[in-house]
Amino acid sequence: MNTCIQLLILCLVTLTNSENLTDISTETTIENEKEDVTETELLETIENETETVTETELPETIGTEIPAEALNLPQSPKQKYCKSEGQYCSRTIFHRCCGNLVCQLHGFFNGTCVQCLAERKFCIWSSECCSKRCRLFRCRKNPYVQVIPY
């Protein structure tokens, strides 16, 4: 145990000494370089390395383009997070349809907002179906609605 501590102390002392030597040698090198450089050489170097800064050129379209975010914003603040007809929806609170629109799913959490669901489409509530009849999670024909020929 004592030998481990002694070795650790020896390593720390060696590391500290080597850092001090490196700092001293770096400082002397910098001082020697400072003495060798004259003021005119320094000014010439600064002029050569400095670029002339010109006015930044903006693209011509920046004034006429409307940001994409502005185009997708809903009309009222109440509809901030809902989608309009034809847009992507997922039947979650994050991607839901506005108003009376319903989400017609095409895959797992992947759908489109429509007015109502057609026959044999996945449904949860009868109000989602155009026929107003949802049975076993599918929109069905409504047998109570009959077309009367004239």
UniProtKB/Swiss-Prot annotation:
It is found in: Secreted. One of its GO terms (cellular component) is extracellular region. It comes from the Eukaryota. Disulfide bonds join C116-C130, C123-C134, C129-C139. Glycans are attached at N20, N48, N110. InterPro entries: UPF0506 (IPR021712). Residues 1-18 form the signal peptide. The keyword Disulfide bond applies. Its main location: secreted. Keywords: Disulfide bond, Glycoprotein, Knottin, Secreted, Signal. Belongs to the UPF0506 family. The presence of a 'disulfide through disulfide knot' structurally defines this protein as a knottin. This is UPF0506 protein SJCHGC03047. The lineage of its organism: Eukaryota, Metazoa, Spiralia, Lophotrochozoa, Platyhelminthes.
